[in-house]
A protein has these predicted regions:
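C-terminal flanking tails of non-heme Fe-dependent oxygenases
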Residues: 1-172
Length: 172
C-alpha cells in the first residue's frame, strides 16, 4: 500500500524479496514497589515496519509532534502498524517513525508480540521521492549496518540514529 500510494510499486517485488522478519514475544511484569513503571524506554524502531499485537493490557504510548504522550485502547483483535527508522529514510523523510514507549499502569502483566521487518542489503531511496521540492535527505543505506551503528556510542546517543547514519540534511 505504501509503495503504491507513492507510485513506486515497481520497486516492491525486489524490496519484498530482500525482506526478513523478527518475531518477538514480550512480557511486561508489574513494577514492584518503588520501581519505575516504564516497561520499555522511549525509542523509535530501527525496523522498516513494525506490527504489534497485545493482550488486553494497555501501555503503549506514542509521542505526538507537540510532545504529548497518547495512549490508546485497541480492540482485542487490533494490530498496530508503526513506521520504523528505515521507512523514514526510504520515504525520504515523508513517513516519520513513531516515538513510543510502554508504561505499566495496570494491575495485570502485559504481553505483546511484535513483527519487525528488516531488509538485507542496501535500501535505496526511490528517485521518484526526491525532487527540487523534496531534496534527497538520506543516502542509500545498509539496514543491518544501521542496526550495528545503533549499538555504538555514537549511534545510541544520536538524536536521530538513522539521520546520523545515512542522513544528508537534518530532517528529524
Ligand atoms: O510492547 C509493545 O507494545 C511495544 C514494544 C516495542 O516498542 C518494541 O519492542 O520495540
Ligand atoms: Fe518499539
Amino acid at each position: 500500500m505504501v509503495f503504491e500510494s507513492y507510485g513506486v510499486e515497481k520497486y516492491y517485488d525486489s524490496f519484498n524479496e530482500s525482506s526478513t522478519y523478527l518475531l518477538r514475544l514480550m512480557k511486561y511484569r508489574l513494577p514492584e514497589t518503588n520501581e519505575p513503571n516504564l516497561g520499555c524506554d522511549v525509542h523509535t524502531d530501527k525496523s522498516f515496519i513494525t506490527i504489534l499485537h497485545q493482550n488486553e493490557v494497555n501501555g503503549l504510548e506514542i509521542k505526538t509532534q507537540d510532545g504529548d504522550w497518547i495512549g490508546f485502547d485497541p480492540t482485542p483483535s487490533s494490530f498496530i502498524v508503526m513506521a520504523g527508522d528505515a521507512l523514514l529514510a526510504w520515504s525520504n523523510g515523508r513517513i516519520h517513525s513513531a516515538v513510543h514507549r510502554v508504561v505499566m499502569n495496570g494491575k495485570k502483566p502485559r504481553y505483546s508480540v511484535g513483527l519487525f521487518t528488516y531488509n538485507e542489503g542496501i535500501i535505496n531511496i526511490p528517485e521518484e521521492l526526491a525532487d527540487d521540492q523534496h531534496p534527497l535527505q538520506f543516502k542509500p543505506f545498509d539496514h543491518f549496518g544501521l542496526l550495528r551503528f545503533f549499538v555504538t556510542a555514537e549511534g545510541s546517543t544520536a538524536e536521530c540514529t538513522v539521520k546520523a547514519y545515512c542522513g544528508v540534511l537534518n530532517v528529524c
